[in-house]
Amino acid sequence: MHFHFSKMHGLGNDFMVVDCLTQNIFFSPDLIRRLADRNRGIGFDQLLVVEAPYDPETDFHYRIFNSDGTEVEQCGNGARCFARFVRMKGLTNRTTILVSTKKGKMSLKVEDDDQITVNMGEPQFEPNKIPFKATQAEKTYLLRAEDKTLFCGAVSMGNPHCVTVVDDVDNYDVDKYGPLVEGHERFPERVNAGFMEIVSPSEIKLRVYERGAGETQACGSGACAAVAVGIMQELLEEDVKVSLPGGDLRIVWQGPGKPLFMTGPATHVYDGQLSI
């Protein structure tokens, strides 16, 4: 059988996006891994699948699979690409789109300048909601990673994140400490590991080692998590520019009890057809 797909990216975090409203495809973990192979397949960080809404109050259901075949709860860069895809393919003409995910609902808004703003919901700091092994919520935790003790924050943006403030993120050994944090025993479902350099109270530099995908050019939910942790640690203001290897995002959060908003681009690269 064959199916149609689009290749897209959000600041270099790249996706294969498939409409499963008009096509019936089962993506097994093995098939996803083969498609994600950058030498023998299409190559991508995540597979995004558009499905019919599970909830009558939503427009679509949004599924995300990492390149290792695991299904995950959230992908902020993917959400922006999802919004552009469903409009580009004529699946909706709405500028505000409500989608359900594995762990909740999200509102996606197409701005006048073609940027996409995603309501990411309220950051969750309770350890059992992340999940993270701790007796109570703290602004900072100590995490042992081989020869280092990391001072980090833990938060869920619909998916788990661990954020560590570092002095020089460009030269930080993300290849070493990313996997150590991702698979740390205190995160029973593994975790996305973010490493944040504070440039000013309104700007950070960030690198993210994503759970199941490795370091990516950009991680939208990771940018949200970093700003949320920075605000809780009283290091950042409520409107922050996040500079990632692939480009910049704007994150706005007014603090506990309020939703967090992410604004950034979504780029269509090409459309294709595959036989499987």
From Swiss-Prot:
Documented EC number(s): 5.1.1.7
Active site: 75, 219
Entry GO CC: cytosol
Pfam families linked to this entry: DAP_epimerase
PROSITE patterns for the chain: DAP_EPIMERASE (PS01326)
Membrane-crossing segments per the record: none
Pathway involvement of the protein, from the record: Amino-acid biosynthesis; L-lysine biosynthesis via DAP pathway; DL-2,6-diaminopimelate from LL-2,6-diaminopimelate: step 1/1
Residues marked Could be important to modulate the pK values of the two catalytic cysteine residues (site): 161, 210
Record has Nucleotidyltransferase as a keyword: no
Gene Ontology MF terms: diaminopimelate epimerase activity
Alphabetically ordered keywords of this record: Amino-acid biosynthesis, Cytoplasm, Isomerase, Lysine biosynthesis
Biological process terms in GO annotation: lysine biosynthetic process via diaminopimelate
Subunit structure: Homodimer.
Homology family: Belongs to the diaminopimelate epimerase family.
General function of this protein: Catalyzes the stereoinversion of LL-2,6-diaminopimelate (L,L-DAP) to meso-diaminopimelate (meso-DAP), a precursor of L-lysine and an essential component of the bacterial peptidoglycan.
HAMAP family per record: DAP_epimerase
UniProt name for this protein: Diaminopimelate epimerase
Species of origin: Aliivibrio salmonicida (strain LFI1238) (Vibrio salmonicida (strain LFI1238))
Gene: dapF
